[in-house]
């Protein structure tokens, strides 16, 4: 029996080692640049306020810290040459872990009694465990306007309150998907007179880093829902802390912590779906809440 047959994960670990070395080069480049800008006071990359807001329909030009993950994405595509397979659909919930199973309660039961079934303080990460065999595959995530609004307003949104987000462009799989969307530049309303051509709201899509279909409502408070494709990626040795779009992600992988024990993911595509009846709560027929209650 060959060594690879004895240890089927050996090839994966060898590939991971190469990814770690490649990522360290990118992190060192970003780290050197940011130390100059921050006086070595923090390992958090702070972007200028002007970058996070539109003024007269334009983005101000600044020499921003380079945290591009394109080399890691190209390496992943080379070593995991899967034809993108959709693993299924998940329905976002602020309080429980998602599941690809079909035998779950309906969306209308989300806030039914007893409320104590929810962990309103420290819910588990939303994304379920994804095996390494699914690296470079995608999953569809459906998010309602109410959940998006709760995150932006920090109301009944424990993952926002706990700032559960690690990394930049590529995030640990226990990062909250809505926080990841916000960290990539997604906003709840279209900027007045603004242009999206410089945004990178789908940074792990190597062919289109702003792969967004549909338009955000111009009228504030107009409800819409999202269908987001998540691309699963290998574990990174380190997830950097970066401040962007009013969200500061957290670092994981410093000397004081162990390597993350799950996969990574990023935003691959976004579909914006405006509701036809703005006053009607989002409870379409067949909308299934796939959740684990244990």
Curated annotation (Swiss-Prot):
GO terms for biological process: negative regulation of transcription by RNA polymerase I; nucleosome assembly; regulation of transcription by RNA polymerase II. Keywords: Acetylation, Chromatin regulator, Nucleus, Repressor, Transcription, Transcription regulation. It comes from the Eukaryota. It is found in: Nucleus. InterPro entries: Rxt3 (IPR013951). The modification N-acetylserine is found at residue 2. The keyword Repressor applies. One of its GO terms (cellular component) is Rpd3L complex. Pfam families: Rxt3 (PF08642). Present with 3060 molecules/cell in log phase SD medium. Component of the RPD3C(L) histone deacetylase complex (HDAC) responsible for the deacetylation of lysine residues on the N-terminal part of the core histones (H2A, H2B, H3 and H4). Histone deacetylation gives a tag for epigenetic repression and plays an important role in transcriptional regulation, cell cycle progression and developmental events. Belongs to the RXT3 family. Component of the RPD3C(L) complex composed of at least ASH1, CTI6, DEP1, PHO23, RPD3, RXT2, RXT3, SAP30, SDS3, SIN3, UME1 and UME6. This is Transcriptional regulatory protein RXT3. It comes from Saccharomyces cerevisiae (strain ATCC 204508 / S288c). The gene is RXT3.
């Amino acid at each position: 029996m060959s060594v690879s047959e004895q240890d089927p994960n050996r090839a994966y670990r060898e590939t991971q080692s190469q990814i770690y070395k490649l990522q360290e080069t990118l992190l060192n480049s970003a780290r050197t640049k940011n130390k100059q800008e921050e006086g070595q006071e923090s390992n958090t990359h702070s972007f200028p306020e002007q970058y996070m807001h539109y003024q007269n329909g334009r983005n101000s030009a600044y020499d921003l810290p380079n945290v591009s993950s394109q080399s890691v994405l190209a390496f992943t595509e080379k070593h995991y040459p899967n034809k993108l397979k959709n693993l299924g659909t998940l329905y976002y919930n602020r309080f429980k872990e998602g599941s690809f199973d079909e035998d779950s309660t309906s969306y209308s039961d989300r806030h039914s009694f007893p409320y104590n079934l929810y962990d309103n303080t420290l819910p588990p990460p939303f994304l379920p465990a994804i095996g390494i065999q699914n690296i470079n595959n995608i999953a569809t995530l459906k998010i309602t306007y109410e959940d998006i609004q709760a995150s932006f307003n920090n109301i009944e949104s424990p993952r926002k309150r706990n700032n559960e987000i690690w990394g930049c462009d590529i995030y640990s799989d226990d990062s909250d998907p809505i926080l990841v969307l916000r960290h990539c530049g997604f906003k709840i309303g279209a900027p007045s007179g603004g242009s999206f051509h410089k945004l990178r709201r789908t940074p792990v899509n190597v062919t289109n880093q702003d792969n967004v279909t549909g338009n955000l409502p111009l009228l504030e408070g107009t409800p819409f829902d999202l269908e987001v494709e998540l691309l699963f990626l290998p574990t990174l040795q380190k997830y950097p802390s970066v401040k962007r779009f009013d969200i500061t992600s957290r670092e994981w992988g410093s000397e004081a912590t162990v390597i993350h024990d799950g996969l990574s993911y990023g935003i691959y595509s976004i579909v914006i779906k405006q509701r036809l009846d703005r006053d009607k709560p989002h409870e379409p027929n067949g909308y299934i809440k796939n959740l684990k209650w244990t």
